[in-house]
Structures are given as structure tokens and as C-alpha cells.
Amino acid sequence: MHSFLLATAVPATLSWSPKVAGVMIACNILAIAFGKLTIKQQNVGTPMPSSNFFGGFGLGAVLGTASFGHILGAGVILGLANMGVL
């Protein structure tokens, strides 16, 4: 019973396309820029192998901004799909 109700509450998801990838990449770039401006101690913790490639971020900052970017991207993709843009 519960799984049937859950299945009816989940909207139809979008199949992957270059548009979807572009939106996800844009959201991750936005999240990295937001992290660059707001994280006070960006290089604290485990350093990344090529820190210049990662903008001087430590492992925690990279994981945090990438996670935020993916959460933001999933929301934007679902929102644009519901609006019919994607």
C-alpha cells in the first residue's frame, strides 16, 4: 500500500540529454563560485592533489561545493522539466 502511494507521488523524470548536462554543469559552476565567495577557510583539511586545479580548495570544500551543486542542479532540472523547458 505504501509503495503504491509513493510511486504515484514521484513525478516522471527526464531522460539524460546534453541540455540536462549543461544545466547540471552550470549549477555546479554556480555552487563553486558561491563557495569561493563564502567559505572562509577554503584550504583547511586534506589538500587536493593539484590544488591550483581545484581553486585552492581543500577536500572538504570540494566535496561541499560539489554536493551543493548537485542538489541545486537536481532541483533546477526537476523544476525546468515541470515547467516544460527541458
UniProtKB/Swiss-Prot annotation:
InterPro entries tied to this protein: PSI_centre_PsaK_sf, PSI_PsaG/PsaK, PSI_PsaK, PSI_PsaK_bact
Any single biological process term in GO: photosynthesis
Source organism superkingdom: Bacteria
Organism name: Synechocystis sp. (strain ATCC 27184 / PCC 6803 / Kazusa)
Annotated compartments: Cellular thylakoid membrane
Membrane-topology annotation of the record: Multi-pass membrane protein
Keyword terms: Membrane, Photosynthesis, Photosystem I, Thylakoid, Transmembrane, Transmembrane helix
Residue intervals passing through the bilayer: 14-34, 61-81
Disulfide bonds: none
Protein name: Photosystem I reaction center subunit PsaK 1
Similarity comment text for this entry: Belongs to the PsaG/PsaK family.
One GO location term (cellular component): photosystem I
Keyword Transmembrane helix: yes
Main location: membrane
HAMAP family (alphabetical): PSI_PsaK
